[in-house]
Amino acid sequence: MAGKRKARKLPLVQTEAILPDLQSCVLCEDVRCEFNGMQTLVGVLNIVPTPKLPVNYMRLCIWTRWCSGAGRFHQRSKIVGPDDNLTIAQAEVDFDLKQMEGHATNVHYFGGVQFQQFGLHHVEIYLGDELRLRFPLPVIEVKPPSA
């Protein structure tokens, strides 16, 4: 059968990105990479209790996982103050999702984060210019234990 060629499937050319879902987002004090490639989130935060201000964190991390999308994307993560005007910490990263079944995990490390006000702060996650997630982070005053 000279002249006959075996048909082969060509990869699909993707012209438009398929926006991913934000599967998970966690604010924590550290992210460790274990020997098996898994990640361990340390000191998960949902509130910042403090007897006085300012309160400092040597390190804070925002861990995100995106799935069910395809294309190249830009993520911006922010921690904003109670008035929504003050950005306390911000980081950005570009990432790729090559296939719909895949996922992308991003970790933003912030050093020397300082909260100078009590009140309801927020963590914000943007995909491009679109706000995809916003959750509260209360900084509250706690009385030190009496002696």
Please annotate each region the language model reported:
Residues 2-147:
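Contiguous segments within soluble domain cores/interaction surfaces
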